[in-house]
């Protein structure tokens, strides 16, 4: 390490050696990820996120000078890292793979947990991602201001804030922290309150914070920069000669620039004039950098409109790239600088392979899935697969007429649907949807999209089950009444009493010896047609097939001839719900059938 100057200041050469550490913010929905970053940077991005849940990765550079200002007199260390670059990963657990990309890019992570709610499903998922990528992390135990009796001290470090609390409040905080310690232990992590830790390589630090009041945030920032410098220093050393690599956050039209890319540069360097390869839904683009624009520090790249042009940018940084032919660039995919002696086509092939691994287009039965970015698509595909919902097509872009026709070709009514995340429906697709009556689910919040589809699917299943059971031929038995033969044949019309079960139109009848006699074509009571008759009713029925006096006689018992497949369903699913008279008729019917075939209906 180079020698520092006497006053503890860092030389420009030293600063340039270390890149800004990338910090990933992860956690459960509504536990305060975006609010925490808002508190740090003083912006209000959270207010215009759909459903107040961040749905696209954002990037915020917090310079060391701001961290020093925030921490005040508590800032005593001589630090060489230039600041922190926060990636605000989407809050909902469906974005596993987008988070995974964030996790793989991140040098450090903040796992934010509502101290009053504890671990939730997405908290656990975030931990698993961090474990998978071996990303060091700290826990921000948020919403301490909601502990009953808490006295807020705006932007105070934890030591000062705790000094103003009652003993009972401090005890409550301690209890909640140790509940988190217990939860973390379940997942294989030793943890403690950050100011009680001797070795951060072995113990996860828990930092009580309030994103609303700013309490504990100075401690959080100090711990992050300290960890980065102490344990990640070698990983942060920049090799300026290395060709840049980044992830495309968003594709945007900018006045005077045309189509631009918002990019997280996570490795190497990018310069004006560099040849770059950019991922698209189909073939990657090979183009040249026309301009590089960098937001002023403390500005979130999605929210900033005024940018400073620069000649080159070194990782890690959030930048805007202007170049020709970017119209089809795909958000969430890779951007790479072509280094000296490298083959652009070979790099394009690598990027294409990455994208093809996500896109799905098979002949199997499944839903049609459309999303606005490759990251959204990855998350949705993972979520649907986890729920065992098959996918026929998964692609980026608006809902097209072709998508509708593909959905209509799916014969399974539960899967003949289109799911659209944050995408529009093209006009010709809309008219086709109305014509073919294809269910379409749209939302710009992932969990809302999935919940609405799942709710519809459950209702549809119930409807289909009801229709299936209604189509089952039910047990029924009638006795032909004496002196009630109104017509002998073509069709035979006789008066009957329903002695058990139900009779309805178009059901076949058999005698007690198993002989088929004909099919009920009509049922009347007091000269009025009725759809069915139940036990105890006396009605007239018309029967196609028999002649009274030959195949059927007064006093005969006739049974509804239940198809064997239906008999199995009745035996397995419906028998326990049937009335006693229905059960008796069904068992007598089975007895008749099994005289000839003992395995019938089994």
Swiss-Prot record:
The organism of origin for this protein: Methanothrix thermoacetophila (strain DSM 6194 / JCM 14653 / NBRC 101360 / PT) (Methanosaeta thermophila)
Region (G3): 88-91
Lineage: superkingdom: Archaea
Residue ranges of the region described as G2: 52-56
Positions bound to GTP: 27-34, 88-92, 142-145
Chain spans, region G5: 210-212
A Pfam family this chain is assigned to: GTP_EFTU
Record protein name field: Probable translation initiation factor IF-2
InterPro entries xrefs: EFTU-type, P-loop_NTPase, Small_GTP-bd, T_Tr_GTP-bd_dom, TF_aIF-2_arc, TIF_IF2, TIF_IF2_dom3, TIF_IF2_dom3_sf
A cellular component annotation (GO) from this entry: cytoplasm
Keywords: GTP-binding, Initiation factor, Nucleotide-binding, Protein biosynthesis
Region feature (G1): 27-34
Encoding gene, per UniProt annotation: infB
């Amino acid at each position: 390490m180079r020698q520092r100057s006497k006053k503890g200041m860092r030389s420009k050469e030293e600063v340039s050696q270390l890149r800004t550490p990338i910090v990933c913010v992860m956690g459960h929905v509504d536990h305060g990820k975006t609010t925490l970053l808002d508190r740090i940077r003083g912006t209000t991005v959270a207010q215009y996120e759909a459903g107040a849940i961040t749905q696209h990765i954002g990037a915020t550079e917090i310079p060391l000078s701001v961290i020093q200002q925030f921490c005040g007199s508590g800032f005593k260390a001589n630090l060489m890292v230039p600041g922190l670059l926060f990636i605000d990963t989407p809050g909902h657990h469906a974005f596993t793979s987008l988070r995974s990309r964030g996790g793989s890019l991140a040098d450090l992570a903040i796992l934010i947990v509502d101290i009053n709610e504890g671990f939730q499903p997405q908290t656990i998922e975030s931990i698993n991602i961090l474990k998978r990528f071996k990303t060091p992390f700290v826990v921000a135990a948020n919403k301490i201001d909601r502990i009953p009796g808490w006295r807020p001290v705006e932007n105070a470090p934890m030591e000062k804030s705790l000094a103003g609390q009652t003993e009972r409040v401090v005890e409550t905080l301690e209890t909640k922290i140790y509940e988190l310690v217990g939860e973390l232990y379940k997942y294989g992590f030793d943890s403690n309150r950050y100011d009680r830790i001797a070795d951060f390589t072995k113990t996860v630090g828990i930092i009580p914070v309030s994103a609303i009041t700013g309490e504990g945030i100075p401690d959080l920032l100090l711990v992050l920069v300290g960890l980065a410098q102490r344990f990640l220093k070698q990983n942060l050393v920049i090799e300026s000669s290395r060709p840049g690599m980044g992830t495309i956050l968003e594709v945007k039209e900018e006045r005077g620039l045309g189509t631009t890319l918002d990019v997280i540069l996570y490795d190497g360097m990018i310069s004006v004039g560099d040849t770059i390869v950019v991922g698209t839904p189909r073939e990657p683009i090979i183009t040249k950098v026309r301009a590089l624009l960098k937001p002023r520090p403390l500005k979130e790249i999605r929210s900033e409109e005024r940018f400073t042009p620069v000649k080159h940018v070194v990782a890690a940084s959030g930048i805007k790239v202007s170049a020709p032919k970017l119209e089809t660039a795909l958000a969430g995919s890779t951007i790479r600088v072509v280094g000296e002696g490298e083959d652009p086509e070979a790099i394009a092939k690598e990027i294409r392979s990455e994208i093809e691994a996500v896109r799905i287009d098979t002949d199997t039965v499944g839903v049609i899935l459309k999303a606005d970015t490759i990251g959204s698509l990855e998350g949705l595909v993972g979520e649907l697969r986890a729920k065992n919902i098959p996918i026929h097509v998964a692609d980026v872009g608006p809902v097209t007429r072709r998508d509708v026709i593909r959905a209509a070709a799916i014969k399974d009514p539960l899967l003949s649907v289109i799911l659209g995340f944050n995408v529009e429906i093209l006009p010709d697709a809309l008219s086709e949807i109305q014509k073919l009556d294809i269910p379409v689910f749209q939302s710009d919040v992932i969990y809302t999209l999935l919940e609405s589809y799942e709710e519809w699917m459950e209702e549809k299943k119930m409807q289909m089950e009801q229709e299936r059971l209604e189509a089952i031929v039910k047990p029924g038995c009638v006795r032909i009444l004496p002196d009630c033969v109104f017509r002998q044949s073509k069709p035979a019309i006789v008066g009957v009493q329903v002695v058990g079960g139900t009779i309805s139109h178009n059901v076949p009848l058999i005698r007690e010896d198993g002989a088929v006699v004909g099919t009920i074509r009509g049922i009347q009571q007091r000269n009025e047609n009725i759809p069915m008759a139940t036990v105890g009713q006396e009605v007239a029925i018309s029967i196609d097939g028999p002649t009274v006096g030959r195949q059927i006689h007064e006093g005969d018992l006739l049974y509804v001839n239940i198809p064997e497949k239906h008999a199995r369903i009745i035996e397995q699913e419906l028998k326990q719900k049937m009335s006693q008279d229905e059960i008796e008729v069904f068992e007598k019917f089975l007895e008749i059938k099994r005289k000839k075939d003992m395995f019938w209906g089994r």
